[in-house]
Structures are given as C-alpha cells and as structure tokens.
Amino acid sequence: MAAYPAVSAPYGLKPINLIGGQVFAGSTRNFPIQYNYGTAIYYGDAVTLTAGYATIPTYPVNSTNVVVGVFLGCYYTNPTTKQRLYSQYYPGSVLAGDITAIVCDDPDTLFQVAATTSAGGTTIGSVSSLLVGSNIVGGTQTGSATTGNSSMSVVSASAAGATTAGFRIIQLIPDTQISTSCTYVSGGAPSATSVVVSGLAVNTYLPVGTDVYNLVNGQLQYTGATLSSASTVTTTGNTTLTVTSIATQVAGTVVLVQTPEATVKFNFGVHRYNIA
C-alpha cells in the first residue's frame, strides 16, 4: 500500500517539537554569516559556528563535527538593489556585511527527516524499527537553488550507528510508511538471515531498513528482522530477501514495511550547547 503523501526526495531537517513534552514555540536565534562566505546554506541544513559566524559543518555531523542548530533562512541587504532581501537559502558569495542566518538552536528540538540509501544520494530509503532509540548517521548537506531547500537526510542502515553518530532516532513516522504484501515460501526461521517470498511485482524496490512482518488475523506481527541488503525484484516468482537475524518465524502472508521518515534529535555531544 502506497503512502500519502509520498516522500519523493530528502528535504533537510524540519523542526517539529521539543523532547519531553516541552512547549514548542518555534523560536529561533540570529547568527551572522561572514561577508562573501562562499558556501551555500539551504533551508534545513545543519549549521555550526566558526569564529562566531554561521557556517556549514564538516561532513558528517557527529561528536567531532559539532553543530549549533538548523538553518531556517536568512536576510541581508542585496548588494545590487540595496534593499533588504529575505531568502529561503543563502546562495553563497554574497557581498554584504549584514547577512543574518535564522537558526533553530534549541538542543532539545525534535526534527522530522527523510532517509536516503546513501549519504549523498536522493533515493529514498527506510528507517528500521530496530533502530528506534539508537543512533543513525546523517547525509551530506547539499540543496536546491530552485526550492532553496536542503537535501540533507539520514542514511538507511540495518544496524545502529556508532556512539559518535550525529543523530538519535526518537520514533518512526507512520503517515508515510509503504506496505507491500507477499507470500512466504521458505526459510525465515529464528536466527536465519534470509527468507524466500513470492508475489512481489517486478521492479519493486526494497531498501535496506525495510521491516519484515507477518500478517496474523489481520494484525501485523514484527519478526524482528529488517532488510540488510537492498532488493529489486527482477522476475516474477520467488524473491530471496537478505535480512538481519530473524526473531519470529516468517510465515503465511508477509508484509514488508518501508519507513521513509523518522523523528530524530541531535545526539548528546553533537550540539555545541551540550558540550562542556
């Protein structure tokens, strides 16, 4: 079953709430951007401070490449028109001395973010249920001059990221999940790392992080497994899926659930305000 709305591309980090039920006012802080700073900054990019100026941090965001928040636009005096210009993104190399970045800098902010299959790619991936409460690596910080939006993401994985990884997964976002039904054929025993299914349409793409469920009496039962290798169905008939260690026997009707988006926050030690 396809999701609506569909997630077609990464869009950066979108602030949605604060952790712990705190009141979220959507407040921001202004930081200067250096005259003629040469790197573009897009709406939804993580930013850091360099000598007091907002800049793009070194990739990947982690406990070494720390951040001060997420860029939500800027304003400056247009050097040609001499009028104040408000912009979704900073294009880079602007000859103005009053460039001001608008930054969501609260370290308790929760962000909605899409997963991609690679750090610099735009192909949408999946965040596994196995990783909730664990760490995940962030993608590279690029964006679109057409929309002004970032294409930063988190990177699909079948195992938790290192303790230095930039983000902690707080929860999955069910609204945009994609469910694909198929039929169990063989394998799929507890501790196994593969299962054979049938009934998948040709060209169906299943990214790493796609979770494997049994459909039992109309209810989803998690098998404790997720795809550890991406799979594209090339022929009708049987498809072998490579998965993490299975906890519950796969059987009957199988539902493969992709989760393109998750709620995350910056890990402790990644945000500059949480560093001693």
Which residues fall in each region the model found?
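Active-site-adjacent substructure of cysteine-protease-like catalytic cores
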Residues: 203
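Signature of Asx- and small-polar-rich beta-strand/turn repeats characteristic
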Residues: 237-243
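Surface-exposed, low-hydrophobicity beta-strand/loop segments enriched in small/polar/acidic residues
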Residues: 1-186, 190, 198, 207, ...
